[in-house]
Regions:
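Hydrophobic residue at the +6 position relative to the catalytic HRD Asp in the kinase catalytic loop
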Residues: 277-279
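ATP-binding N-terminal substructure of ATP-dependent carboxylate-amine bond-forming enzymes
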Residues: 1-116, 120-122, 126, 133, ...
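Short loop/turn motifs at secondary-structure junctions and domain boundaries
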Residues: 267-272
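Active-site nucleotide/adenylate-binding loops and adjacent lid/helix of ATP-dependent enzymes
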Residues: 1-8, 75-79, 118-207, 260
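Phosphate-binding site of ATP-dependent enzymes
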Residues: 176-260, 281-288
Length: 288
């Protein structure tokens, strides 16, 4: 959906843009790849977000080539024909520096942060170590690994309620908000499906703000109020599942502080071009 929106916007502004799925790629392409950029529809299908989180195994079965590569047929060949690759990707392989590194090795320019900063920002444990070192306020946290037998005894020492999340997830996938010990065990069982390392965080209650950084300046904060209890995958992508207010209805001093915090985070993690920092404004007026 992100890529489709970007592609349509670029084409409406006169650019020769096409949409290529990183994993599925294109099974059949013309001998002259540059002619793809003249496709009348930009190769953009009608895109929608399903109510349920994507089933990765089903997605994998959708590609004829069942090999181990995470990059679909002809993707890199097409990228090498482009003047610029606009990365509209989320999660593993898209935001974690892998595709960025591949494009760097091919000498293909792309949007967003480079491979190292992308990898650092995607790894929540590494990024939180950097934020702590830079004095940027972040909830108390603990890294739990490897497997339920090892993680559960450590988790039982955590104050409740807390936040349990995979260290490398995106789009609010792999994030759980257990309220008690029974929910904590179930959360660990679920989150360990995403990988062997689990991040446990102190739960901070308050208003959810998001601040984007573009270049070297921050943009007005956006406040998100989910229709349900939490801002999960559905609330993030389904129309009507959350109310987003921009600019957020906060005092000027809070807006300034949120912007400065986002810019500090952007610089601390070595990000470039653009980024987005999510934060909580607690009842005492502190930003996390």
């Amino acid at each position: 959906v992100t890529g489709t929106g970007v592609c349509h916007a670029l084409r409406e502004n006169g650019h020769r843009a096409i949409l290529v799925d990183l994993f599925l790629g294109l099974e059949e392409v013309p001998a002259d790849l540059e002619t793809l950029f003249d496709a009348p529809d930009g190769l953009c299908p009608d895109a929608k977000i399903e109510v349920e989180a994507p089933d990765l195994e089903t997605v994998k079965r959708g590609r004829k080539d069942q090999g181990p590569s995470h990059i679909g047929p002809h993707v890199l060949d097409i990228c090498q024909k482009a003047d610029l690759v606009f990365l509209g990707l989320h999660g593993m392989d898209g935001e974690d520096g892998r595709i960025q590194a591949a494009l760097d090795l091919l000498g293909v320019p792309y949007t967003g942060a480079g491979h190292l900063a992308s990898a650092v920002a995607m790894d929540k444990a590494v990024s939180k170590q950097i934020l702590d070192a830079c004095g940027i306020p972040t909830p108390k946290w603990r890294l739990l690994s490897y497997g339920l037998d090892e993680a559960e005894p450590l988790a039982q020492t955590l104050p409740m309620p807390c936040v349990i999340k995979t260290i490398g997830g995106g789009s609010s996938l792999g994030v759980y908000l257990p309220e008690d010990r029974a929910e904590l065990k179930r959360a660990l069982e679920e989150v360990l499906r995403y990988g062997a390392k689990v991040l446990a965080e102190e739960r901070i209650y308050g208003r959810e703000l998001t601040v984007a950084v573009l270049g070297d300046r921050w943009l007005p904060a956006v406040e998100t109020v989910p229709a349900g209890k939490e801002f999960d995958y559905v609330a993030k992508y389904q129309a009507g599942a959350a109310v987003e207010t921009c600019p957020a209805d906060v005092p000027p001093a809070v807006m300034q502080a949120a912007g400065e915090l986002a810019l500090r985070t952007h610089r601390a993690l070595g990000l470039e071009v653009y980024s987005r920092t999510d934060m909580i404004l607690d009842k005492d007026g502190k930003l996390w």
